[in-house]
């Protein structure tokens, strides 16, 4: 099995976990292909070159599975690099809170053994696509978690005129608007009081950021809707953020957000559910009084 390993910079205390991961992959006789930037980091920072491994850069088409080693941010960057290649991704958590990277360091060995036995499931995660006649969004105009429209600085609010399937919804006067997928419902959207959706829900969430009116609340819409946004700003510009990748945009252009025509494939263990993740990561039901 050809396994790609993608990662990000980390502290030295994570090195034993990383070494254990590569040792297990070698014990399972996998063909290991390490993301070039991650390989360079391990070599330069820790003088560590994993045995029996090759380097992969832009061409990932020959990989069977990709391991994302880090946190949810690393997982999102990995999804960008996988693009439309339809390669399943397994998130291994060496960061902090991880909804996408939910395999803990103490679960790596047993999870990899399950992986090589084919004992796992794949969840198809919806992506958002943003388009504009005048902007290419860095060549990758998709987001797995959310697309956020935000004011550029600490100045006054922006106004976001919003249409659903060409029918006027409202004009948000706010610091911004977060359009989130079910996957992104536990990310930025949740921090601005958006609801949590199950990964299999076929919906998007529109959550205003610090709206001028307290009556303006998040709304859940079907994911086959096309969202059209037109922004007004006193600074004549605003920010568009795709999973944290931000770009300045001028006012006067029309943005369209819709469901992408492909999905990100996420590997999950059979014995672990989304409800367990919610309990563990959000500490639902925990009593800390003692």
Go through each PLM region and give its residues.
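ATP/NTP phosphate-donor binding region
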Residues: 1-65, 106-121, 132-141
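Short glycine/serine/threonine-rich phosphate/pyrophosphate-binding segments
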Residues: 14-15, 73-78, 186-191
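Glycine-rich phosphate-binding loop
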Residues: 66-73, 176-177, 181
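Gly/Ser-rich helix-loop-strand patches that form or flank binding pockets
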Residues: 77, 82-94, 99
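Catalytic core of DAGKc-family lipid kinases
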Residues: 96-175
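ATP/nucleoside-binding phosphotransfer catalytic cores, i.e., glycine-rich phosphate-binding loops
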Residues: 149, 154, 165-168, 214-290
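Short aromatic-centered micro-motifs
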Residues: 162, 184, 240
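Gly/Ser/Thr-rich active-site loops/lids in small-molecule metabolic enzymes
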Residues: 170-174, 179-215
